[in-house]
Amino acid sequence: MERMLPLLALGLLAAGFCPAVLCHPNSPLDEENLTQENQDRGTHVDLGLASANVDFAFSLYKQLVLKAPDKNVIFSPLSISTALAFLSLGAHNTTLTEILKGLKFNLTETSEAEIHQSFQHLLRTLNQSSDELQLSMGNAMFVKEQLSLLDRFTEDAKRLYGSEAFATDFQDSAAAKKLINDYVKNGTRGKITDLIKDLDSQTMMVLVNYIFFKAKWEMPFDPQDTHQSRFYLSKKKWVMVPMMSLHHLTIPYFRDEELSCTVVELKYTGNASALFILPDQDKMEEVEAMLLPETLKRWRDSLEFREIGELYLPKFSISRDYNLNDILLQLGIEEAFTSKADLSGITGARNLAVSQVVHKAVLDVFEEGTEASAATAVKITLLSALVETRTIVRFNRPFLMIIVPTDTQNIFFMSKVTNPKQA
């Protein structure tokens, strides 16, 4: 079963992620608790999802950085968590518990039914595009033609995750790969073209989740102001990059002296924004070590509008492919990858195990807007006159970018830019 994520376009251009879960051979949900009319519980579970999503995002980020500390990072925690939650529909016993705990859900406070309800509500909320902001998220199952799925699983997959199902001939691996990749390509508006590179003929099912986001900056950068400038990879090493700029504006700003970093927020039109975190020289590791849900909350709560004389941000396009198996093992999701896996909620028999979880993300940041898997908006206004004491913010060294909705603590995309020229 595989799930593909559409891309999200953001103020700069950001693109999207696609995680996929491949299954090879090897708890009942309470309908009443999952009704769309359950508004009171909806607020509770939505907050629970956002909190777990942030915790999962930072835990995953730290593992990705450990593997490649000097590389760019780009991923959609929400896309990955949705794909794994989708998989958990068919999991039982230890396999189920490991997946949900790995996603950072507190199972003593939130039931399995509430977790799926929160994803159901999120999907309904996301799939509401407007002229200002295009945002959609989807799920799909690619199932071996001879595999018989339980009615309960297919019904829950459709009702909770809006999942489409496609009969797939995995014996013809080239055709199966094309079918899946074409689905992802269409869902991400062409941003993700080769999510699946290798497909075993023994594959029984592929789960795909996709998220697409497209938005414009409330205050776009003027292309005529973009110029070549230095981006410092270290104190003594730099590369020349196209540097965008804004002048004389008022934006949410916070100087975090405790963590030696500067935080600014740039808004998109619509309900989305991007947080940019700029550590002081040689302070990136200290900031990364303190990436916690409470840190993000403190940053967002501490933002105050401030007059900025000049803001410089590189124009860039980065993409990364990840095989998440080892990282998910580090996060406690182990049994699903072994012969002990209990995914009997899918077929009724314990004959499936996860062989691979792959994820691809693309982020494009440019003058007019962003295309990516998530977005949040922050208002930027021009000053009527030059300020006497000018604050200048230069993103000319490694920085972090987090794309968030303005009304929740969810994280749609998270990126670390160590080298804008490193595609």
Curated annotation (Swiss-Prot):
Record keyword Signal present: yes
DNA-binding region: 235-237
Organism domain of life: Eukaryota
Record's keyword terms, sorted: Acute phase, Glycoprotein, Protease inhibitor, Secreted, Serine protease inhibitor, Signal
Glycosylation (residues): 33, 93, 106, 127, 186, 271
Positions of region (RCL): 369-394
Modified how: N- and O-glycosylated.
Region (O-glycosylated at one site): 381-389
Gene Ontology CC: azurophil granule lumen; blood microparticle; collagen-containing extracellular matrix; extracellular exosome; extracellular region; extracellular space; nucleus; platelet alpha granule lumen
Tagged with keyword Glycoprotein: yes
Domain comment in the entry: The reactive center loop (RCL) extends out from the body of the protein and directs binding to the target protease. The protease cleaves the serpin at the reactive site within the RCL, establishing a covalent linkage between the carboxyl group of the serpin reactive site and the serine hydroxyl of the protease. The resulting inactive serpin-protease complex is highly stable.
Note: Alpha-1-antichymotrypsin can bind DNA.
Purpose: Although its physiological function is unclear, it can inhibit neutrophil cathepsin G and mast cell chymase, both of which can convert angiotensin-1 to the active angiotensin-2.
Protein name from the UniProt record: Alpha-1-antichymotrypsin
Organism of origin: Homo sapiens (Human)
Biological classification of the source: Eukaryota, Metazoa, Chordata, Craniata, Vertebrata
